[in-house]
A protein has these predicted regions:
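Short amphipathic alpha-helical segments, especially helix-boundary/capping motifs
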Residues: 15, 62-63
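Short loop/turn motifs at secondary-structure junctions and domain boundaries
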Residues: 58-60
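Short Cys/His-rich metal-coordination motifs, predominantly Zn2+-binding knuckles/fingers
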Residues: 45, 63-64
Length: 100
C-alpha cells in the first residue's frame, strides 16, 4: 500500500528529507532528480540519516560515518552491519507516495 507523504518539490536535488509514514520516519533522497525512500534510522546507533550527507546515491550517517546505498538500503561502509529498509516510491501529480 502507498500513502502520500509529501510533494516532490519538498526534496531539492542533492538533499534528503525525513517524512512520517505510519509512525516511522522515512527519508527521501533526491539524487540527480530521482527520488529514493528508505527508513531514516541508521542501523548502527539509530541516528537520523536525513541529517547525513548525500553524495550521488550514497548517504553517510552524520554520527559514525556508516554509508548506505539509497537505491537499495545496502551497507557500503560500516560500522553499520545491517542494511536500512528501502521502500518503493512513486510520484503522481507531484505527490510523493511511499510504501507502508
Amino acid at each position: 500500500m502507498f500513502v502520500k507523504i509529501g510533494n516532490a518539490t519538498d526534496v531539492a536535488e542533492g538533499n534528503i528529507r525525513a517524512f512520517d509514514v505510519d509512525g516511522t520516519k522515512v527519508s527521501v533522497a533526491n539524487s540527480s532528480g530521482h527520488l529514493y525512500a528508505f527508513d531514516d534510522t541508521c542501523t548502527h546507533m539509530g541516528c537520523s540519516l536525513a541529517h547525513g550527507k548525500l553524495d550521488g546515491t550514497t548517504v553517510t550517517c552524520p554520527c559514525h560515518g556508516s554509508q548506505f546505498d539509497v537505491t537499495s538500503g545496502n551497507v557500503l561502509r560500516g560500522p553499520a552491519q545491517r542494511p536500512v529498509r528501502s521502500r518503493a516510491i512513486q510520484v503522481e501529480g507531484g505527490a510523493i507516495l511511499a510504501e507502508t
